[in-house]
Each structure stands twice: as C-alpha cells, then as structure tokens.
C-alpha cells in the first residue's frame, strides 16, 4: 500500500497523468459527446461520480472480494453507479439524458473507471481511492470540456447553446465551420491538446 499524498493523488491524473491526453484512455466519448459543451460537461460530471464512488466501494470491499471473481464484482459496482446516475439524469435532466443516449450506459466499459479500480482502489484505502477516482474523473472531464468548447464555438457559434458570435460578424461574411461538428475534428482537437501538453511537459515526450 503506497503512502497517500492528497495533492499528488488528486492533481497527477488532471495534468501529468491525464487519462485521455497522456494515457490515451476513454477517447471514444471525445468523439461522441463533445459537439456541445452541455453534453460534455454532464458526461464529465457523470464519470467523476461513477469513478469516485466505484473506486471507494471497491476499496471498501477489497479484502472481501475473492481474486477469481474480482472483475465481475467491479463490473457490478460500476454498473450500479452508472444506472444510478442514468436514472437521476432521466428524472431531473431528461433532455440532456436523451441527447447523451447510450453513452452514459457505456461508462460501464470505460477503461478509466475499471483501470483505476484495478491499479489503485484494490491496493489503497477508501479515502485515497475516492480522491484518485475523482481526480481521474476531473482530468477526463477537463479534456472533454476543452474539446467541446472549441467544437461548439467554431462549429455553431454558441456556448452552452447561447449565441456568442455577434450577428455583425456574420454580416461581414463569417461562417461557422461545419467541419467542427463532424466526429473526426474531435480527434484532431485532441491531438492538438496532446501536442501542446507534451510541448510544455518535456518529460512526456518520447525519446
């Protein structure tokens, strides 16, 4: 069991060990839910909740789970959290839930959630596991929000559905970039984020 450092455990997955831009995990949702900021933000918050609580519960159960069925137990715990989040969204934010459709359910198979349970929660105390799960969720959500910000702004001229580019700009001939709302642009923007991060953090560059 590693010594628990709150700052390192929480901040490392946001920056140096970001699950998307560094570990390249969970990138499918960067294609699916980043056309609009609202959907990306809700998806990010959902992953934060699921990852944090799943890591906490699995850490609490780590000494009682037989090794041969640990993956099954982890999947049950994650599925339970995902169903809970999905039902809350359907009850209180139905329009967003309908927009995200099956992608909330696919959190169950997200490599980040299962990866943190296997790599951290099963070998550390509950509070440390909770912080690690939340940190990884925040790192995931941050990338989604950045990608969605540029896709919505440049592709639709809006932020959270509100028009932010003045009509006068359009009158001068400006047009929204239709390419931004196409799925491939999410990967291109993600590639730009990875390039910028590795340009700043030299230790991430491959030798």
What feature does the model see in each segment?
Residues 160-179:
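Short, membrane-exposed interhelical loops at transmembrane-helix boundaries
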Residues 37-53, 73, 97-108:
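Structural signature of hydrophobic alpha-helical transmembrane segments
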Residues 84-99:
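Transmembrane alpha-helix boundary signature
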Residues 1-11, 201-207:
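Intrinsically disordered, low-complexity non-transmembrane regions of multi-pass membrane transporters
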Residues 54-67, 114-124, 198:
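C-terminal ends of transmembrane helices
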Residues 25-31, 47-52, 79-86, 108-112, ...:
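Hydrophobic core segments of alpha-helical transmembrane domains in multi-pass membrane transport
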Residues 65-78, 99-105, 132:
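Cytoplasmic-side transmembrane-helix entry/capping segments in multi-pass membrane proteins
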Residues 12, 59-63, 128-136:
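Short amphipathic alpha-helical coupling elements at transmembrane boundaries
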């Amino acid at each position: 069991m590693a010594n628990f450092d709150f700052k390192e455990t929480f901040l490392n997955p946001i920056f140096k060990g970001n699950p998307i831009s560094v570990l390249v995990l969970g990138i499918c949702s960067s294609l699916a839910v980043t056309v609009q900021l609202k959907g990306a933000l809700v998806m990010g918050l959902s992953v934060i909740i699921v990852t944090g609580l799943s890591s906490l519960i699995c850490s609490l159960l780590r000494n009682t789970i037989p090794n041969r069925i640990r993956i099954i137990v982890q999947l049950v715990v994650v599925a339970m959290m995902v169903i809970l989040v999905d039902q809350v969204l359907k009850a209180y934010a139905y329009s967003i839930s309908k927009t995200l459709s099956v992608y909330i359910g696919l959190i169950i198979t997200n490599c980040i959630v299962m990866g943190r349970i296997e790599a951290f929660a099963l070998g550390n105390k509950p509070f440390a596991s909770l912080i690690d799960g939340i940190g990884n969720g925040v790192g995931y959500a941050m990338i989604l929000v950045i990608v969605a910000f540029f896709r919505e702004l440049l592709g639709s001229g809006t932020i959270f559905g509100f028009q932010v580019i003045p009509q006068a700009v359009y009158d001068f001939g400006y047009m929204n970039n239709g390419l931004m709302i196409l799925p491939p642009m999410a990967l291109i923007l993600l590639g730009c984020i990875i390039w910028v991060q590795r340009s700043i953090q030299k230790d991430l560059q491959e030798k």
